[in-house]
């Protein structure tokens, strides 16, 4: 269970903390998962810094599980770097800290990277005891220096190295396994040739294969959606005489048996809904899903249905959105507002900035009316 994320000096962020721990509200208990709230939403005007937070998560996913030859450090806040000057090392360092629990252990993981393409400091604490520390190329594991060997990239986290070498260390491997189950969907980049879904556990699964693998389950979920066509994805087995341009996957609608369309003709709305549900269903219970601008993929009514599936699946979800309709289903401790001011972004929890808010209050109406006085620059 992810408990807290703290990000410092990454992209537009000065410092930002997202706390998943529930407050003492006595309503909407369906949004409570153990001692945390789920999902958690981030709102804010364009340019408020919401995307910076998700790009930090993306950077973590890449560092922990992707091709070592393509790793890059967290991009630091350019305003801070320019103000401090290139000689100030701290201004060139970005970091992320995570508190989480898994398999009965409480962890604190800290990872920083620098513009010099190295890791100034990384550490993993388990149950208040230091398991390892990686600082300026020197790795201390269980209190002893750990040999890294030659030709090890300075940007490969120590956690990644140790989890692959010390496979019998269940405490360490459990921490790495938990963080490796993070998945990020960068919806503003959904038309990018480089892809927009990031998850080391899903590997190189193609869009078609992902849709096909969860087609039956998605179809049953869609039965609960209002006015949504029911369909399934079928995989076409190629024959020796098949044309090279024959579609590999087909779209089949319920009630129109015997007829199908190439998957390429599937509408963007249908594809986005199916992809989000297929990805969610592919994640293990207890995994974490991060989605930037969820409303780019889902209709307002579909977002609420999607959040219902998130609750039932028991996957933690952190998302940003401009669709305020979802606010009607969230508690004050589930909502954060991003704010950009003088070059720095931060996030503010509604239950902190407006502690007297109650169930009777209309959060959506208050937000649209600028009652909270929180938001970024347009």
Stretches found by the model and what they are:
Residues 1-4, 304-378:
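C-terminal lobe/lid and adjacent interdomain/linker elements of RecA-like ASCE P-loop ATPase modules
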Residues 1-62:
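Pre-Walker A-like glycine/lysine-rich segment at the N-terminus of P-loop NTPase domains
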Residues 3-5, 94-98, 118-125, 129, ...:
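Short polybasic amphipathic segments
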Residues 13, 297-298, 326-327:
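Catalytic P-loop NTPase motifs of RecA-like helicase/translocase cores
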Residues 35, 39-41, 54-108, 114-116:
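Conserved P-loop NTP-binding catalytic core
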Residues 38-47, 236-281, 288, 294-301:
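Conserved ABC ATPase signature
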Residues 108-233:
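Electropositive, glycine-dotted interaction segments
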């Amino acid at each position: 269970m992810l408990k807290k994320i703290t990000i410092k000096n990454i992209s537009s962020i000065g410092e930002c903390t997202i706390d998943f721990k529930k407050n003492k509200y006595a309503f909407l208990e369906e949004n409570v998962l153990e001692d945390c709230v789920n999902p958690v939403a981030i709102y804010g005007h364009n340019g408020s810094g919401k995307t910076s937070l998700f790009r930090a998560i993306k950077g973590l996913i890449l560092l922990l599980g992707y091709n070592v030859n393509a790793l890059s450090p967290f991009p630091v806040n350019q305003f801070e770097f320019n103000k401090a000057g290139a000689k100030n090392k701290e201004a060139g360092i970005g970091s992320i800290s995570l508190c989480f629990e898994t398999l009965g252990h409480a962890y604190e993981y800290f990872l920083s990277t620098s513009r010099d393409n190295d890791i100034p400091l990384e550490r993993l604490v388990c149950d208040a005891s230091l398991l390892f520390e990686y600082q300026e190329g020197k790795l201390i594991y269980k209190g002893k220096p750990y040999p890294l060997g030659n030709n090890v990239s300075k940007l490969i986290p120590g956690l990644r190295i140790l989890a692959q070498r010390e496979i019998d260390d269940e405490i360490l491997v459990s921490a790495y396994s938990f963080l490796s189950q993070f998945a990020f969907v960068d919806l503003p980049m959904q038309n990018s040739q480089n892809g927009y879904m990031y998850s080391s556990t899903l590997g190189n699964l193609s869009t078609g294969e992902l849709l096909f693998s969860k087609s039956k389950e998605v179809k049953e979920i869609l039965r609960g959606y209002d006015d949504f066509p029911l369909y399934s994805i079928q995989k076409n087995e190629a024959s020796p005489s098949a044309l090279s341009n024959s579609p590999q996957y087909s779209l089949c609608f319920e009630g129109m048996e015997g007829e199908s369309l190439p998957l390429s003709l599937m509408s963007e709305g249908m594809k986005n809904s199916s992809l989000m549900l297929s990805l969610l269903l592919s994640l293990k219970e207890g995994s974490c899903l991060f989605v930037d601008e969820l409303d780019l993929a889902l209709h307002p009514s579909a977002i609420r249905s999607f959040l219902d599936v998130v609750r039932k699946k028991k996957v933690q979800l952190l998302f940003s959105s401009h669709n305020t309709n979802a606010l009607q289903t969230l508690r004050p401790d589930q909502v954060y507002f991003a704010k950009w001011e003088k070059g720095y972004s931060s996030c503010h929890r509604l239950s902190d900035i407006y502690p007297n808010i109650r169930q009777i209050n209309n959060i959506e109406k208050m937000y649209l009316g600028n009652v909270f006085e929180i938001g970024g620059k347009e």
